[in-house]
From Swiss-Prot:
InterPro entries: Ribosom_uL1_bac-type, Ribosomal_uL1, Ribosomal_uL1-like, Ribosomal_uL1/biogenesis, Ribosomal_uL1_3-a/b-sand, Ribosomal_uL1_CS. This is Large ribosomal subunit protein uL1. GO terms for molecular function: rRNA binding; structural constituent of ribosome; tRNA binding. GO terms for cellular component: large ribosomal subunit. One of its GO terms (biological process) is regulation of translation. Part of the 50S ribosomal subunit. It comes from the Bacteria. Belongs to the universal ribosomal protein uL1 family. Keywords: Repressor, Ribonucleoprotein, Ribosomal protein, RNA-binding, rRNA-binding, Translation regulation, tRNA-binding. Binds directly to 23S rRNA. The L1 stalk is quite mobile in the ribosome, and is involved in E site tRNA release.
Length: 235
């Protein structure tokens, strides 16, 4: 087992072996974000679902009210006047067959891919390169649409797509260490409400098993899910 650095050992010593109240947990994670860059704050949610069953899968989007603090490079696959609409709305890349061909060759200089429905038969052929990276456009995620301007605006403003992995765990970034504790709490509350609102129909037993939050380089802190659910929406 690799030896922990003095910095990590010191940070771990600050985290007690208990479940923290939401705001208290966020304040501790912020305090432990001591790297020389603005660390990303992440949530890791273990749910009582088995995604190998279609009625226990979770894939949706959340619009974080305080944004993510990160810029998102968006690529759009469409044709005709829609390409100009995409560029005007702020897409970094926009193309038709040429962009499909470039992606097929492994050129993936973007964080999010949006496509219009008419281009999906061609985009579907890119499943081998897009699928493993979680970049395949999907109507449920809002990344297959004819309203490109609205979609680009939402994702630039902090809308995120997330899904439960094969183990039923959701990993989502919800801000930066430079955010205020209240801003992070507002984002985390919105994430919790979104996960509850999109509970899979086949989920059985206890839905929320655990919620941990952490910064990029810091230790994780367990959050009291019930206390988070009980917070007022304008907490």
């Amino acid at each position: 087992m690799p030896k922990l650095s003095k910095r990590i050992t010191g940070l771990l010593a600050k985290v007690e072996d208990r479940v923290y109240q939401p705001l208290e947990a966020i304040q501790l994670v912020k305090e432990n974000a001591t790297a020389k860059f603005d660390e990303t704050i992440e949530a890791h949610v273990r749910l009582g679902i088995d995604p190998k069953y279609t009625d226990q899968q979770l894939r949706t989007t959340v619009a974080l009210p305080q944004g993510t603090g990160q810029s998102v490079r968006i690529a759009v696959i469409s044709r005709g006047e829609k390409l100009a609409e995409a560029k005007t709305a702020g897409a970094e890349l926009a193309g038709d067959d040429d962009l499909v061909e470039s992606i097929g060759k492994g050129q993936m200089d973007f964080d999010l891919l949006i496509a219009t429905p008419d281009m999906m038969p061609k985009v579907a052929k890119l499943g081998r390169v897009l699928g493993p990276r979680g970049l395949m456009p999907n109507p449920k995620a809002g990344t297959v649409t004819t309203d490109l301007a609205a979609a680009i605006k939402e994702f630039k403003a902090g809308k995120l797509e997330f899904r439960a992995d094969r183990a039923g765990i959701v990993h989502v970034r919800f801000g930066k260490a430079s955010f205020s504790a209240d801003a992070l709490l507002e984002n985390l509350k919105t994430l919790q409400e979104t996960i509850d609102r999109n509970k899979p129909s086949g989920a059985k037993g206890r839905y929320w098993k655990s919620l941990y939050i952490t910064s990029t380089m810091g230790p994780s802190v367990e959050v009291d899910v019930t206390a988070l659910q009980d917070l007022e929406e304008d907490a």
